[in-house]
A protein has these predicted regions:
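Positively charged n-region of N-terminal signal peptides that target proteins for export
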Residues: 1-4
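Boundary of Sec targeting at the N-terminus
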Residues: 21-25
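Bacterial N-terminal signal peptides
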Residues: 8-18
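Primary mode marks residue(s) on the alpha4-beta5-alpha5 output face of response regulator receiver
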Residues: 27-132, 137-251
């Protein structure tokens, strides 16, 4: 009897494993990786708002002594990075790789050095950002900004230590519903997409009903810095839907 019980238990485990593998195989590898490494909830202690369905942004914090000086120092470092890596080929040689470029003129492409991006989860070196932002122009790729990152569960205090919340805008990509590998491209990308980073599906219930892969948080917190643009810290002028109480607005 004990042997039969053990055999039944073993078969049950095997079936469960096989089912998990089969389900995983329904989705592209990159979505499976996002699911594995992504966050399990989009809740955060950081005072934040939703912009559209898939982006969560920090609220402007109360100015603190030294914020302006810190921000200026970051801009100086970012400007030096852009000058050094003005030639995108040099960035590539130093380990920066383009993240899903479309080839569309005017697009902004993140060139990410994954070793440096991992290091940013522990400490920040403003002269070695995890990502450099290039804009595609008729003259080639133009270095226009840098991106610094923090863990997806970072607190407001941690974000503020890296770039002052009274000046910088931090964001996370949230509420992602991955589609099956057989999904037509227009279902995952473009204005009519249901799945993916810009899809109309943005709740767990709707994602499950559509047999999608629900990923509450994709990647961690990130902030873009454009040292030579009028809006160097980009984002404060974006239209957002609040997901936090009004009492948090001045925190």
């Amino acid at each position: 009897m004990k042997k039969l019980h053990a055999l039944a238990l073993l078969l049950g485990c095997c079936c469960a494993t096989a089912l998990a593998v089969a389900l995983a195989q329904d989705f592209p590898l990159w979505e499976q990786l996002l699911s594995h490494y992504g966050g399990k909830t989009d809740e955060t202690s950081v005072p934040s708002m939703k912009m559209g369905n898939h982006m969560q942004t920090s609220l402007q914090g109360k100015p603190q002594p030294g914020d302006d000086e810190r921000a200026q120092a970051i801009l100086v470092a970012a400007r030096e990075v852009l000058a050094h890596y003005a030639d995108v080929n040099l960035a590539v040689r130093y380990g920066y790789k383009p993240f899903h470029p479309s080839g569309r003129m005017g697009e902004e492409v993140h060139y990410t050095n994954y070793r440096l991006a991992r290091r940013e989860q522990e400490e920040i070196d403003y002269t070695q950002p995890g990502s450099i932002l290039y804009r595609r122009t008729l003259a080639g790729m133009k270095a226009v900004g840098v991106m610094y990152t923090a863990p997806r569960d970072a607190t407001a205090e941690r974000l503020n230590q890296i770039a002052p919340l009274s000046i910088a805008t931090w964001h996370r990509h949230v509420d992602f519903c991955g589609g099956p590998r057989t999904l037509p491209r227009n279902e995952q990308f473009g204005p009519g997409a249901r799945f993916g980073p810009q899809g109309s599906i943005h709740t767990e219930d709707d994602c499950r009903a559509a047999h999608g892969l629900w990923i509450p948080v994709v990647f961690g917190w990130m902030t873009h810095v454009y040292p030579d643009d009028e809006n160097a810290w980009g984002g404060m002028d974006m239209q957002m839907e609040s997901n936090t109480g009004a009492a948090n607005l001045q925190k």
